[in-house]
């Protein structure tokens, strides 16, 4: 897997993570998003799943009873570690499409076009070129991370935004 970057130089993805990163980047730009957005979104995904689309929180095995129960939390899965109702909706989307939920294109299509108001939010954010602000916005508004209001995490983000 490769892509054209800049002035005719090519990037050859060799590791599984590089292949996922390139797939996400190509998806974002093909859908009108900026490379800065792709970078920020990838940073979030890397932190969440290590860019492993088959990852399940705490490296648990797949358990259908937990996975399809929207009340089950702490059983996030996929690139963005979707949990609760979002996890169930992703799984049902994949099932309706007769595709594997672990496939990167399935997860990207779901997040970009089928995740309700969160899809609209991604598309709006994807037009920005401020990678630092995007990293925070993705964390706070799209991911709705449990750490977003943690004072220590806020201090870290504030320090990074000053640098």
Feature-to-residue mapping (PLM):
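Peptidoglycan-targeting cell-wall enzymes and recognition modules
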Residues: 6-23, 46-128
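Surface-exposed acidic, glycine-flexible loop patches that form ligand/cofactor-binding
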Residues: 30-36, 123-129
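Loop/turn elements at helix/coil->beta-strand transitions in domains of secreted/extracellular proteins
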Residues: 33-39, 118, 132-133
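Acidic helix/loop microenvironments that form the catalytic cleft of cell-wall polysaccharide enzymes
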Residues: 45-49, 125-150
